[in-house]
Amino acid sequence: MRFLKINMKKFLPILLLVFVLSPTFLFVVDETQQAIITELGEYKRTISKPGLSFKKPFIEKVTKFDNRILSTDAPPGEYLTLDKKRLVVDFIARWKIVDPLVFFKSVNNLFSANSRIEDIVFSEMREELATHNINEVIAENRELIMDEVKIGSTERLKDFGMELIDVRIKRADLPSEVQRSVFDRMIAERSRISKRYR
């Protein structure tokens, strides 16, 4: 029993030291994450399986990325249709990081990724909406238009280690000044009709 007490006194500081230093050489990759390891800024390896992993203390750096489906909710943008009508459209894009190394080297973080997605999808949508009239955009061919936007955007996002899963128009409205004139015209027409019945 005395031998056990002496050995515990010797090993307790060692155990405490290992416990304190363990974050420098151990890290956990969650099941919703993937990670890349860099050594002094140079890529070493990718970890895509969840669990406990090791790294060289103080030399290797771990950068974790989400491997779930993420979404980008873009602010409204103004587009011109084939029949020269202006539309205010906002969209939502669902995407995923498929190559963490390319993602890390090209955009590095979610804020930059969201900006890049907004720019690319906005550009593709501007090109696609310019080939359709306002009725097709609002009612008739919205699915077809969004499929074309997705195809064009997906190809461009591969260069950033991202895969576009879906793009949807949340809202498509006329600009506020046009809405006001439409409402004024509707009110004038209704009052003209009501005067006929008096």
Placement of each model-derived feature along the sequence:
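Aromatic-capped interface at the extracytoplasmic side
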Residues: 20-39
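Short beta-strands and strand-coil junctions in structured, solvent-facing domains, enriched
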Residues: 26, 43-45, 79, 100-103, ...
